[in-house]
């Protein structure tokens, strides 16, 4: 066939049957996949039958038959098998991706920060000749185990904040494509945040009645700070010791220890 892989064909591909006779032929009737087909006379008793495959053709090994006579009208035996064992298989079924999910190695599996590994999992319905994966606009070569694939990518400080986008395009042996697959099957997603939080206000005081800048035994030290965004992990020390308590002011990014 004229497919990239000449032993396979898909809808829209042309299949050829080439044959050579010991003399000039007449009354040629070439059928390919059960349908009468066109043929070319290349001269010197060389011929080529050809046919454009479509969605109505049966899948599997493509059959053919060559009926003919010589110029005098004598009929020779039909030709329906190759002499060099070549064959063309026809596939009109589009491959399907399933079990598509995405996660990260962050403690929160639906979030990722700089240096975290984002993993994309998927399963193919049939063998492939090519698969292309993009994660956050970067080409990734997936690892394959049977029909299962995993593609991983380390997130960088140059990656844009927000939902991590991906794309999978898989072609089966005949070149049928899944198209551009960009959504998970289970609704999973990973949100990337590569912007470090900033403390834009830090205030340190005491409950001393005379001077909040002085503390004596029995006074409480207060450390107030405001973050540019909500924080998921805090480590605070006062005078080298862990504070009695740290809490967030409700509905704000203001914290107190």
Roles of regions detected by a PLM:
Residues 1-8, 96-111, 198-214:
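Short, solvent-exposed loop/edge segments of extracellular or virion-exposed proteins
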Residues 13-17, 116-120, 219-223:
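Structural beta-strand segments of beta-rich domains
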Residues 21-27, 124-130, 227-233:
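Short proline/glycine-enriched turn/loop motifs at strand-loop junctions of beta-rich domains
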Residues 45-51, 147-153, 253-257:
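Short strand-edge motifs at loop-to-beta-strand transitions and within beta-strands
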Residues 53-61, 155-163:
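Surface-exposed, short loops/turns at beta-strand junctions within beta-sandwich domains
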Residues 63-69, 165-171:
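Extracellular recognition modules
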Residues 69-78, 171-180:
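Short, solvent-exposed loop/turn segments at the edges of extracellular beta-sandwich modules
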Residues 82-99, 103, 182-200, 205:
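Flexible, low-complexity linkers/stalks enriched in Thr/Pro that connect modular domains
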């Amino acid at each position: 066939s004229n497919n990239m892989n000449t032993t396979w064909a898909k809808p829209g591909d042309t299949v050829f049957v080439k044959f050579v006779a010991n003399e000039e032929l007449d009354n040629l009737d070439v059928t390919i996949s059960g349908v009468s087909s066109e043929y070319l006379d290349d001269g010197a008793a060389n011929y080529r039958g050809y046919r454009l495959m479509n969605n109505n053709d049966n899948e599997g090994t493509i059959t053919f038959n060559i009926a003919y006579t010589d110029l005098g009208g004598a009929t020779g035996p039909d030709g329906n098998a190759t002499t060099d064992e070549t064959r063309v298989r026809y596939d009109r079924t589009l491959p399907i991706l399933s079990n598509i999910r995405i996660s990260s190695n962050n403690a929160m599996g639906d979030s990722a920060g700089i240096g975290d590994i984002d993993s994309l999992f998927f399963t193919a319905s049939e063998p492939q000749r090519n698969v292309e994966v993009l994660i956050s606009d970067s080409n990734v070569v997936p690892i394959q185990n049977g029909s299962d694939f995993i593609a991983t990518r380390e997130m960088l400080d140059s990656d844009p904040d927000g939902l991590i986008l991906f794309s999978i395009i898989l072609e089966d042996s005949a070149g049928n494509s899944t198209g551009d697959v960009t959504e998970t099957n289970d609704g999973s997603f990973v949100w990337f945040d590569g912007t470090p939080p900033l403390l834009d206000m830090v205030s340190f005081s005491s409950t001393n009645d005379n001077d909040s800048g002085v503390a004596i035994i029995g006074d409480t030290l207060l450390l107030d700070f405001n973050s540019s965004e909500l924080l998921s992990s805090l480590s605070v020390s006062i005078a080298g010791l862990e504070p009695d308590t740290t809490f967030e002011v409700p509905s704000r990014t203001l914290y107190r220890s």
